[in-house]
């Protein structure tokens, strides 16, 4: 009995030792990965890095003109590194050609870079952030910002009977800044009462319960921020055009010639089509599979291109240069949506 207990303790200790060694190897590989990333930085960025600090990556963040902008320090946001840093402070600096300047406190919120009103003068600026822990460990990252114009109104179509028990969710697409105070929603210019019966709110999403055709309309979300330098709230808006349609027929017909007539040394192609029964539904996905059953994408030699319009989805299989090895091969066209799955095959033959 004593011997069995000793053997068990030995194996448990060995397992813990192996796991610890494996974890150390993983951490070392992560560090090596970011060291290599540091080596690829342009000189105008790398010259400002502190050799004592670990490098934690770069981030290219999008910003909208006239709206708030925020960015996290890359190592804090990166899933490979974030677990290493818990209690820390973040210092932000703006990188210029021959100097770096500390970012003022008014442009930092909760440790993130914060610009209350992003204008063109901020575009393409580079920022260096340094994360320092209580133990004195430090890691640095580089952030660049670029202007991106948000869509004015994004259309969304919902078919009754699809996910009625979950409701229709509308996302307020404020992708450029966090730390907002609250969001108010309007339908057709009238403020929505969040009563948790017909309408509820979860973060940036409005959920419309018990969907019906009358829920169609224009939905605007107004995002309220605050800033110590501005008396009134900063307000940013996004728009959705919701169209609710009756339940549709999701059947479709798959069309494909059973033979591909080819000539050695020349290109060839064949198109597989899916025609939906309902013109309002465009939910069929088509994939080509090679003789081994693997999906064909943008491969060399043989590749497929997918297009969709007006209830008709097409996937064209292209052969850049037909060789003898293709003759006799059978390729499968698979069309499917949430409800149905269909396949047809075609064989390569010499003309």
Swiss-Prot record:
Localization annotation: Secreted
Pfam family, one: ig
Designated name of the protein: Soluble interferon alpha/beta receptor OPG204
Induction: Expressed in the early phase of the viral replicative cycle.
Function (record text): Counteracts the antiviral effects of host IFN-alpha/beta and key IFN-inducible proteins involved in viral RNA degradation suxh as host OAS1. Acts as a soluble IFN-alpha receptor and thus inhibits the interaction between host IFN-alpha and its receptor.
Family: Belongs to the interleukin-1 receptor family.
Glycosylation sites: 117, 182, 261, 269, 321
Record-annotated Ig-like C2-type domain positions: 65-137, 155-237
Disulfide cysteine pairs (residue numbers): 73-129, 172-221, 272-333
Ig-like V-type domain boundaries: 246-345
GO biological process, any: symbiont-mediated suppression of host innate immune response
Signal peptide boundaries: 1-23
Main location: secreted
Assembly information from the UniProt record: Interacts with host IFNA1.
A cellular component term, taken from the record's GO annotations: extracellular region
Keywords in alphabetical order: Disulfide bond, Early protein, Glycoprotein, Host-virus interaction, Immunoglobulin domain, Inhibition of host innate immune response by virus, Inhibition of host interferon signaling pathway by virus, Interferon antiviral system evasion, Repeat, Secreted, Signal, Viral immunoevasion
């Amino acid at each position: 009995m004593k011997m069995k207990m000793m053997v068990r303790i030995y194996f448990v200790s060995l397992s813990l030792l192996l796991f610890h060694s494996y974890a150390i190897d993983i951490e070392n590989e992560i560090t090596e990965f970011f060291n290599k990333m540091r080596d690829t930085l342009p000189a105008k960025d790398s010259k400002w890095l502190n050799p004592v600090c670990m490098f934690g990556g770069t981030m290219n963040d999008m910003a909208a003109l006239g709206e708030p902008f925020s960015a996290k320090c890359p190592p804090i946001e990166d899933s490979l590194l974030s677990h290493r840093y818990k209690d820390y402070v973040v210092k932000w600096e703006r990188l210029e050609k021959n100097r770096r300047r500390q970012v003022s406190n008014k442009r930092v919120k909760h440790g993130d870079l914060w610009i209350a009103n992003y204008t063109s003068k901020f575009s393409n600026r580079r920022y260096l952030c340094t994360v320092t822990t209580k133990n004195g460990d430090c890691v640095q990252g580089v952030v660049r910002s670029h202007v991106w114009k948000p869509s004015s109104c994004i259309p969304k179509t919902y078919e009754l009977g699809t996910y009625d028990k979950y409701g229709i969710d509308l996302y307020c697409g404020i992708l450029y800044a966090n730390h907002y105070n609250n969001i108010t929603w309007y339908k057709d210019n009238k403020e929505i009462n969040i009563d948790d019966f017909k309408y509820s709110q979860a973060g940036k999403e409005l959920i419309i319960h018990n969907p019906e055709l009358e829920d169609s309309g224009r939905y605007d979300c107004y995002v309220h921020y605050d800033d110590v330098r501005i008396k009134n709230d900063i307000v940013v808006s996004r728009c959705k055009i919701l169209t609710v349609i009756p339940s549709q027929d999701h059947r479709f017909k798959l069309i494909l010639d059973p033979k591909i007539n080819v000539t050695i040394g020349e290109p060839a192609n064949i198109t597989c089509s899916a025609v939906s029964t309902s013109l309002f539904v465009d939910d069929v996905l088509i994939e080509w599979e090679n003789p081994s059953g693997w999906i064909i994408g943008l491969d060399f030699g043989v590749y497929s291109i997918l297009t969709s319009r007006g209830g008709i989805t097409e996937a064209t299989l292209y052969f850049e240069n037909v060789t003898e090895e293709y003759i006799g091969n059978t390729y499968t066209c698979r069309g499917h949506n949430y409800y149905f799955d269909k396949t047809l095959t075609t064989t390569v033959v010499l003309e």
